[in-house]
Amino acid sequence: AMRPVFEQQRPVFVHADELAQIRHALGLAERFELRLVIVGGADAWRMPELLRQRGVPVIVAGVHELPRRRDDDVDTPFRLPARLAQAGVQYCISRVGGERSASNERNLPYEAATAAAHGLAPEEALKAISLHAARILGADDRLGSLQPGRLASFIVTDGDPLETTTRIERL
């Protein structure tokens, strides 16, 4: 069951928010030669160069969060995707964990919109909840973008999908 992990055919997803947790995960991945994906990554903005150099993607688990520290700017979580994008770190935006996480998936476009309002280009915000996620999961050859031969679920809206007033017209 673990062979694909140790042969680097499958990544290891590690939930790590704090800087020390991320560093520890990076150390373990290096020691055991594992493909690593950081899930959460609240402090990833503090070490983007290292994440980029090691090719470690980050699944940003919630843009709509409070800052981790009292002295962090209030918009620190909102700016995390833009900071990772600017540093060249592979990332996506998701909602992770909790007893109501599935019902909160409907808020994913709002999280992308918040990231767009705080420095992430709107097109990148849409990719952060589609193509980038598929790429991190190794499924971008069949999911994440509208191309011939790929699986797709998509929506038709009456406006910008990143606007809270936009309505879905068709699924």
Q: Where in this protein do the model-derived segments appear?
A:
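Solvent-exposed alpha-helices and their adjacent loops that cap or buttress functional pockets
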Residues: P4-E7, Q147-P148, T164
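Short aromatic-centered micro-motifs
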Residues: L171
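Short acidic loop-to-helix transition motifs that present clustered carboxylates
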Residues: L19-Q21, A42-R46, L131-A134
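Conserved strand-to-helix beginnings and helix N-cap segments that scaffold or border functional pockets
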Residues: L26, E105-P109, I168
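Metal-coordinating catalytic core of metallo-dependent amide/deamination hydrolases
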Residues: A1-G27, R31, H64
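Catalytic beta/alpha-barrel core
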Residues: F13-D17, L34-D43, V63-R69
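His/Asp/Glu-enriched, well-ordered alpha-helical/loop segment
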Residues: P11, E49-P57, A61-E65, R70-D158
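Short, Lys/Arg- and Gly-enriched loop/turn segments at beta-strand edges
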Residues: L162-I168
